[in-house]
């Protein structure tokens, strides 16, 4: 598989919408990158999704994916830490020392998107609950969790919430992942690490996290 195909599989989600982010090269007072987030409702074919990822990895257009799918299930989730003064390397090492099956990626603004990956889909409500427990255990109990929704009312136009994906620009990305020692990973290294730490639904159910 190509790199774009691997990312499309790793971050499988809703096929009825996607997001884009266009930066305006300004920074808000809180440190968050300023720009325009747009959610686009569209039925995505395999080729559509592949093109979105190719454009993302090449640095042409950033893509956002909705974690919760049409069946209200997820194969990945994220803890979104919108704090821009934290030491991401230290946090990545802390997560590793707690032996949590997570990988930390630098967000577009310099915060943290902390991901968990699964071998197969689980109910969004279950994943959200577990991620809230984990977030509290690492000291971020009040942050946003993706999936944000546990059920989508698709017939009413509900399309969930997108999360901007890592590795915009591929090898040259500022949205890279950190390994257990706090070193930056290449896209391929990240995908290999995500495979190493992915959980089965049963392993997720049994996962316990404490400070």
Model-derived regions, located:
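DNA replication initiation on ssDNA origins
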Residues: 1-76, 85-90, 161-162, 167-170, ...
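Short secondary-structure junctions
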Residues: 15-20, 100-104, 142-143
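Structured alpha-helical segments in the cores of large, soluble enzyme domains
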Residues: 59-61, 88-105
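Short beta-strand
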Residues: 66-68, 102-109, 144-148
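Histidine-centered divalent-metal-coordination microenvironment in nucleic-acid enzymes
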Residues: 79, 102-127, 153-166
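Anionic group-transfer/hydrolysis microenvironments
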Residues: 82
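Helical (often loop-to-helix) elements that flank the catalytic cores of nucleotide-handling enzymes
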Residues: 88-97, 117-144, 173-189
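C-terminal polymerase-core module
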Residues: 144-185
